[in-house]
Amino acid sequence: MHIAEKGLPSEKSIRIQFNESIINGNKLGNLDLIAIPLASTLNELKQRDINIFYRTVDQNMLPKEEQIEYFAAIEDITFIGYPSGLYDNVNKLPIIRQGITATPIWNQFNGENVFLIDAGVFPGSSGSPVFIYNHGSYPTKDGIAIGNRLLFIGVISETMIRNEADAKSYLDLGKVIGSKVMYEEVTNFIQRINKV
């Protein structure tokens, strides 16, 4: 984790090690995701006068049903992550990439709670948050709308690979777990840990 100085990431970082029981015990329902409660870790670091730089995505960034109704079948997407562990080590920033939806967000690809994106999705992309980000104008099912959009639509869970006899080839496609079902499972998880 990057240490914050004056509200910005510094060149300093701190490694936080989680034991396997935390990882194995925090699966989000049937999704290929886990949740790691960080409040106690962040509080402990704060008591040691160590401030961690982080950003959050709150539920206000999730698309509402009436917004989803106007999504186009093909939407521009932006995702943020560390493909193959790559990041800007000097500025302590992840890599931002863009692409399009390869299947409509509102459909369940092959009956799963996922949709596909067509972008530079490589190993190490799993866990990357995916957003619809439009500046100036954006498509709707009825035409074009003027304005800006920033909506959290999911998290990459898998890189799509074609296995061939002598090699694997990356299809530049990724599976994305939709933010709505993810939020429902996070809510269930929070209720479960609050009972303990």
Language-model segments: residues:
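Serine endopeptidase catalytic core focused on the charge-relay Asp
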Residues: M1-E112, D118-A119, P123, G127, ...
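C-terminal cap/linker of serine protease catalytic domains
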Residues: G136-V196
